[in-house]
């Protein structure tokens, strides 16, 4: 068990957010957490004001956000402030927290250095040298952050949440599954084209669930494959359970090494058919703990191989679940890595040594 800290956790609340899963992990790991959802500062003003503020990260709402962070720190006197992708944080706020003897942590799943060129990173990039620790998702990000002046950066991975993402009951079988080949998520990269080819060219019995972004599909394809909308929490878990084959893709436009969804599918005991990528191959053994594809054609071949083979899918899904647990692809294990890194950082900040 890592050393217990008093933590001010600045993150978006709500059961739909993985930041809440991380909060639960901290509490299970014996941390004293004061959670604060400050997203309302970013919601001030009309639509145009919000869009401009998000791009520039400046103005009265940004200043108010930073004053509130410092107020909460004064009231609660934490050992550390953990920022879960807080784009409104100003460098001066982090310097003030350090002067107060409070360590600061930045946890960000997304990639400010990727080719996707998402807006909103202007102020964030300026804060990189001021955080005491960055927790990032990619090997390349370690270099990226250090080149920007990061004091310390370590890699941890996304994870499944064991309290909500667990396997189905023991007697669960194909008679309980009404989704043949399934994808639950967003149409990043070329996924819409991939799904279109699966359904139109190869007649794959496909079901897609997710946000309204899937309206980018051709209307005929959309009407044929899209159902149930966005799935969260219990609905997401049961969507995985009800799927004979669960697809997972790497987001190349974010330079991701692995897919968060892969750990969730494995954690929930689903049969995982995922894109072949080095980060996946390091974490799951091919045809033992999951199946892989590198193209639409190979994906179709794997579907034809495994869709009629319920016993084979069950065997691989069970091995994938065992690997996810044994190798620590869960939130507790991943958050523990960050907390252990803080065991030397927090005392150093308190002594004014950083």
For each feature predicted by the language model, list its residue ranges.
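Nucleotide-sugar donor-binding catalytic core of glycosyltransferases
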Residues: 2-55, 60-76, 84-92, 115, ...
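Short, conserved structural micro-motifs that define repeat-unit consensus positions
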Residues: 83-85, 97-104
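A short, histidine- and acid-enriched strand-loop-helix "catalytic/donor-clamping" loop
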Residues: 105-118
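Conserved acidic donor-binding segment of nucleotide-sugar-dependent glycosyltransferases
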Residues: 290-296, 305-310
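Short, hydrophobic alpha-helical segments
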Residues: 307-308, 339-353
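A charged, aromatic-enriched C-terminal amphipathic alpha-helix characteristic of glycosyltransferases
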Residues: 308-340
């Amino acid at each position: 068990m890592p050393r217990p800290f008093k933590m001010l956790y600045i993150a978006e609340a709500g059961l739909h957010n993985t930041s809440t899963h991380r909060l639960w992990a901290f509490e299970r790991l014996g941390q004293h957490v004061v959670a604060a959802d400050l997203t309302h500062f970013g919601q001030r003003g009309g639509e145009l004001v919000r869009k401009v503020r998000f791009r520039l990260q400046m103005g009265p709402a940004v200043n108010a956000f930073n004053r509130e962070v410092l107020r909460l720190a004064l009231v609660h006197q934490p050992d550390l402030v953990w920022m879960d992708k807080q784009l409104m944080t100003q460098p001066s706020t982090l310097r003030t927290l350090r002067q107060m003897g409070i360590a600061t942590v930045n946890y960000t799943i997304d990639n400010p250095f990727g080719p996707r060129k998402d807006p909103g990173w202007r102020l964030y990039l300026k804060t990189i040298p001021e955080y005491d620790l960055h927790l990032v998702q990619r090997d390349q990000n370690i270099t990226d952050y250090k080149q920007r002046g990061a004091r310390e950066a370590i890699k941890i991975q996304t994870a499944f949440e064991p309290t909500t993402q667990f396997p189905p009951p023991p007697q669960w079988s194909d008679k309980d599954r009404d989704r043949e080949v399934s994808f639950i998520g967003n149409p990043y990269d070329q996924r819409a084209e991939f799904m279109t080819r699966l359904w139109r060219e190869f007649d794959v019995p496909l079901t897609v669930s997710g946000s309204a972004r899937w309206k980018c599909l051709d209307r005929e394809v959309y009407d044929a494959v899209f159902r149930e909308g966005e799935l969260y929490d219990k609905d997401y878990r049961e969507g995985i359970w009800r799927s004979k084959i669960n697809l997972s893709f790497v987001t190349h436009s974010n330079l991701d090494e692995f897919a968060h969804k892969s750990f969730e599918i494995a954690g929930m005991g689903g049969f995982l058919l995922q894109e072949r990528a080095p980060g996946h191959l390091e974490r799951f053994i091919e045809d033992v703990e999951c199946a892989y594809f590198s193209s639409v054609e190979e994906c179709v071949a794997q579907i034809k191989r495994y869709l009629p083979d319920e016993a084979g899918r069950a065997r691989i899904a069970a091995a994938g679940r065992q690997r996810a647990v044994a190798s620590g692809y869960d939130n507790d294990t991943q958050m523990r890595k960050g907390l252990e890194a803080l065991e030397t950082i927090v005392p150093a900040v308190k002594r004014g040594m950083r």
